[in-house]
Amino acid sequence: HFICQAQGETFMDTRVIYTQLLSSIQFPPFLAMEYIATQPVVESPEQAAYDAVHTCPDIARVRPGETVALTAGSREVYDIVGILRGVIRAVREQGGVPFIVPAMGSHGGATAEGQVRVLEHFGITEEALGVEIRSSMGTVLVGHTQDGYPVHLDRIANAADHIIPIGRVKPHTDFRGPV
């Protein structure tokens, strides 16, 4: 009785399989719940990003013609293209020359080209944003932690006059230990 036929095709009846597999398992009682987020809804992430940069006192440090590296990572961010557009608009209004640098460690096969492909997966392209994507796996040593560990920065971002980090902040899935 595992095999069924419909419209001339034979297939496994998954209901019977699940019933047999799960019949000896006792599940705890479940309660239907609904979670309602109390945080305000951002109607336009693009406008919110523009407003945040446009009203930030530090944007005044950007002088006409200076380069501004905007980071874009491999962690999914809702409407990341809109957010980047808002930041790009604010930087351009200040006279800055924005560009995108991938910020994702070994994702994309740890190659500059692979990281550009990861950004493309999220809709982050030169065509969509009207700015260059400058990708490199090269880094420069910018200092050391208090414990003596070296701190590296993307060499292209380091060469920019300014850097605006944009991305999702979350601990690495393999990180263990106190922060």
What is the predicted function of each stretch?
Residues 78-97:
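Histidine-anchored nucleotide/phosphate-binding helix
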Residues 77-84, 109, 172-175:
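Short glycine/serine/threonine-rich phosphate/pyrophosphate-binding segments
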Residues 1-11:
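Short, Lys/Arg-enriched N-terminal segments with co-localized hydrophobic residues
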Residues 53-69, 92:
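Glycine-rich phosphate/diphosphate-binding loops that line cofactor/substrate pockets in enzymes
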Residues 12-47:
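N-terminal amphipathic/basic leader segments beginning at the initiator methionine
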Residues 114-178:
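An acidic, phosphate/nucleotide-engaging active-site surface
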Residues 101-117:
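Short connector loops at secondary-structure junctions
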